[in-house]
Amino acid sequence: MRGREEVRGRRGRVWSALGLREGDCLSVMGSGGKTTLLRHLAEDTENDVILTTTTHMAPPGHPQDPPFLAFQNLERFRLDWAGMPPPRRLLTGRFQPGGGKLAGLLPEEVDGLADLPGLALLAVEVDGSRALPAKAHASHEPVFFSRSTVGVSVLGMQALGRRVMEGEVHRPALMIQRFGWSSGHRLELEDLERIAGAYLALLPPGRRILVLSQARSVPEDLLRDLARRFRDRVERVLGQSEDGLEVLG
C-alpha cells in the first residue's frame, strides 16, 4: 500500500468519522452492523477499496455491495486487479459449495492483498454473529490478520432489552458462562458495556474504534451515555445508522 497519510481522493462522512489514513487495514469484529459498515466504507469514497472476510459473510447481491470478484488465489487476484481501471472498489471471497455464505480468505491471503498497488483501504470482517446484535466469542475467533492497523468493534444497540437466549443473542451459553448471567437475563446498558469491553479486549495492537450500531433503536441519551464510558479506552466512539456514522466521543 501507499504510505500512511490522509486519504487524498474524495471521501465522505464515514471515512472522516473513522479518521482513516491512506493504506489502513481494518479488522472489523463484533455484532449487529459489521457488513453495513463495510458497505458504507465502499460507497463513501473514490479511492481503491477491498472488502472481504476471514470467516464468512453474506453472499454478494445486496444493492449496496460493490462489484464482486471471486478469489481463487493471490496471483490471479493481482492480475485481475492490475487490469482494472480505478477506482477499484471490490468485494471478494470464495463461494462455498452448497452454502449460502461467502467463505473467507486465509489470514496470509488477506495480508497479501494489503500490498496491492493503489489500494487505499482493506476492510475485513473477522468474525460472525448470525445477524444478531450481541454475541460471545468462541475460542477460534476472531480470525485476525497480521497487517491490521485499525481494530473496529461493532455492537448492535438492538441488544438492549433482549434476553440471553437462543435467537436473541449469538452463543447465549458462552455469554452466561463468561458474564455470570442466568438464562433469559434481560440485557441492560451496563451489560452492553461489559459486552463491548469484551469485544475491545480481543482487538490486536493498533488504533481502536468502537461503533455502536443500530443507533436509532435507542434514545439518544442512552447511546451517548454508553459512548462516554469508553472515551478513555478507544480512539473514538461512533454511532452507526442506515445513513452512516456519527462521532459520539
Residue ranges and their predicted role:
Residues 1-15:
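N-terminal pre-Walker A segment at the start of P-loop NTPase domains
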Residues 4, 200-249:
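C-terminal lobe/tail of nucleotide-utilizing enzymes
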Residues 11-46:
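Walker A (P-loop) phosphate-binding motif
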Residues 28, 49-54, 91-93, 122-126, ...:
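General beta-strand structural signal in soluble alpha/beta enzymes
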Residues 42-95:
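N-terminal phosphate/diphosphate-binding loop that engages ATP/GTP or pyrophosphate donors
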Residues 91-136:
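Phosphate-binding/switch loop-helix module in NTP-utilizing enzymes
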Residues 138-160:
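Inter-motif core of Ras-like GTPase G domains
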